[in-house]
Amino acid sequence: MMDLELPPPGLQSQQDMDLIDILWRQDIDLGVSREVFDFSQRQKDYELEKQKKLEKERQEQLQKEQEKAFFAQFQLDEETGEFLPIQPAQHIQTDTSGSASYSQVAHIPKQDALYFEDCMQLLAETFPFVDDHESLALDIPSHAESSVFTAPHQAQSLNSSLEAAMTDLSSIEQDMEQVWQELFSIPELQCLNTENKQLADTTAVPSPEATLTEMDSNYHFYSSISSLEKEVGNCGPHFLHGFEDSFSSILSTDDASQLTSLDSNPTLNTDFGDEFYSAFIAEPSDGGSMPSSAAISQSLSELLDGTIEGCDLSLCKAFNPKHAEGTMEFNDSDSGISLNTSPSRASPEHSVESSIYGDPPPGFSDSEMEELDSAPGSVKQNGPKAQPAHSPGDTVQPLSPAQGHSAPMRESQCENTTKKEVPVSPGHQKAPFTKDKHSSRLEAHLTRDELRAKALHIPFPVEKIINLPVDDFNEMMSKEQFNEAQLALIRDIRRRGKNKVAAQNCRKRKLENIVELEQDLGHLKDEREKLLREKGENDRNLHLLKRRLSTLYLEVFSMLRDEDGKPYSPSEYSLQQTRDGNVFLVPKSKKPDTKKN
């Protein structure tokens, strides 16, 4: 036997390589690739495809977020369907210095500052509407009235309770002052701090309305006046003096000194009383005794008998338009803070205004009333109503001796002011403010394109830019010289205007098509109803004809006789008519008979 030399197992011959290559090509031709048999290769391909898919999803998510952030800076124009950039809010600059300072404050960034609603919520949580100040103010007069009938040994306990109440009031005032300081530290309310200082510097004129509606609890004789008027009535002053003597005899010297020192204590909100009740409070004597009942009754009679005139009201800051010009905001809200808000209808200014000028008709709005106030004819119409004529029997008494000396001077000033102009309502300001408001109202009616064209000083109106034909528009543009911003704005206005006109025409055509389709549908409904009526009428006619035919059939059949003269039975025979009009009697179970009628 011949020994064949085999190649080493690690080496492959050229024939083997060719055979493997042929078999590989055959597998490829049959659609079988290497991945079918190689599991690791299939795993790699699967991982690669998975990574590509995740990367694609990540890119899509990023693109969606970018589109969302991009469209958040634009707003959709409902007329043209375009996305327009959102214009930032512009602060309107007015002529008054107060508004300039307020606009400067408004430009301060507010990331760390509190908002106005948060401040009001903090104020409401800290101090509720029914606070302890009112309850203490109600409790103190009751103790003061009951102290007349207490024994001397109880005066010390009463004095201690009053001192505790005063300490509570002082602590509440300190807390209120701290809260107001925190509110004034907010950038939004910086303008209110300066205005509050200006109001604190000016001396307030005593207002009869404030005196009649509000009493300070620290002044002892206010509550005693009302109680004495109710109980004593029209008794003489000697009874009151006797009452005071008996009261002073009850108390010991120590208690009386403590009580008089308590009444004449200068720390019990004397600024508040001196500011608002200086015309009605008698100056305390050097001895520190209580005011006499004669002075009290005299001041009360002067208060009740005195009449309120328009010139007296004009001296008050709330009714004088000159004082109202100094402040930009209306100090009218219940919380003491107001930012460019109109006065409420429940405020005292409106009540006095309605009593002096008369209530406006119910059909008028606020804007119409402002236009009437600014019109020159309104002064002549409202002039006679501003100063009501007094009857000859009326007696005008001055509120105080100092005011009594200056009464003729104030009357002449009041007449001069009524001849010149009627004071405007407390909430509204004079003619310059209304003019600015009127111009801002006119600017509010302008469109966005008109405002931009006005800002860039474009000499053509927006309607002309949009509606002119192409040749006329090019000729108009060639006559003027424009910069890049003006040209871009004019082209943008014309493009969007044409798009708007095209959209309007498209909507018009759609509406016309809808109306035409509605008309066609209405015609079809009418025709359908007409056909239904005709069908019903035809059915009724057919039913009538069938009934008449059956009646005629029975009549003819009853007239037929056989050879014996007997009538034919309807169950055995029937009548049939041919096309030529002949009628035959045909038996039902047999062939047609030859008898002819």
Curated annotation (Swiss-Prot):
Regions of biased composition (Polar residues) lie at 333-345, 571-580
Q: Give the span(s) annotated as Mediates interaction with CHD6 and is necessary to activate transcription.
A: 583-588
The UniProt entry, under InterPro entries, shows: bZIP, bZIP_Maf, bZIP_sf, NFE2-like, TF_DNA-bd_sf
Where, by residue number, is the motif DLG motif? Answer: 29-31
Give the sites modified to N6-acetyllysine. Answer: 588, 591
The protein's PTM annotation reads: Ubiquitinated in the cytoplasm by the BCR(KEAP1) E3 ubiquitin ligase complex leading to its degradation. In response to oxidative stress, electrophile metabolites, such as sulforaphane, modify KEAP1, leading to inhibit activity of the BCR(KEAP1) complex, promoting NFE2L2/NRF2 nuclear accumulation and activity. In response to autophagy, the BCR(KEAP1) complex is inactivated.
Question: SUPFAM superfamilies per the record?
Answer: A DNA-binding domain in eukaryotic transcription factors, Leucine zipper domain
Enumerate the residue ranges of region (Leucine-zipper). 514-521
* Effect of substituting residue 30 to A: Abolished ubiquitination and degradation by the BCR(KEAP1) complex in the cytoplasm
Q: Does the keyword 4Fe-4S apply?
A: no
* Location of region: Disordered: 327-440, 563-597
- Report TM segments: none
Which intervals of the chain are annotated as region Basic motif? Answer: 491-510
User: Glycosylation annotated at which residues?
Assistant: 454, 464, 479, 491, 561, 566
Q: Quote one Gene Ontology molecular function term.
A: DNA binding
Cross-referenced SMART domains = BRLZ (SM00338)
Keywords tagged on the record? Acetylation, Activator, Cytoplasm, DNA-binding, Glycation, Glycoprotein, Nucleus, Phosphoprotein, Transcription, Transcription regulation, Ubl conjugation
Please state what the annotation says regarding this protein's domains: The ETGE motif, and to a lower extent the DLG motif, mediate interaction with KEAP1.
Assembly: Heterodimer; heterodimerizes with small Maf proteins. Interacts (via the bZIP domain) with MAFG and MAFK; required for binding to antioxidant response elements (AREs) on DNA. Interacts with KEAP1; the interaction is direct and promotes ubiquitination by the BCR(KEAP1) E3 ubiquitin ligase complex. Forms a ternary complex with PGAM5 and KEAP1. Interacts with EEF1D at heat shock promoter elements (HSE). Interacts via its leucine-zipper domain with the coiled-coil domain of PMF1. Interacts with CHD6; involved in activation of the transcription.
Q: What does this protein do?
A: Transcription factor that plays a key role in the response to oxidative stress: binds to antioxidant response (ARE) elements present in the promoter region of many cytoprotective genes, such as phase 2 detoxifying enzymes, and promotes their expression, thereby neutralizing reactive electrophiles. In normal conditions, ubiquitinated and degraded in the cytoplasm by the BCR(KEAP1) complex.
Protein's name according to its UniProt entry:
Nuclear factor erythroid 2-related factor 2
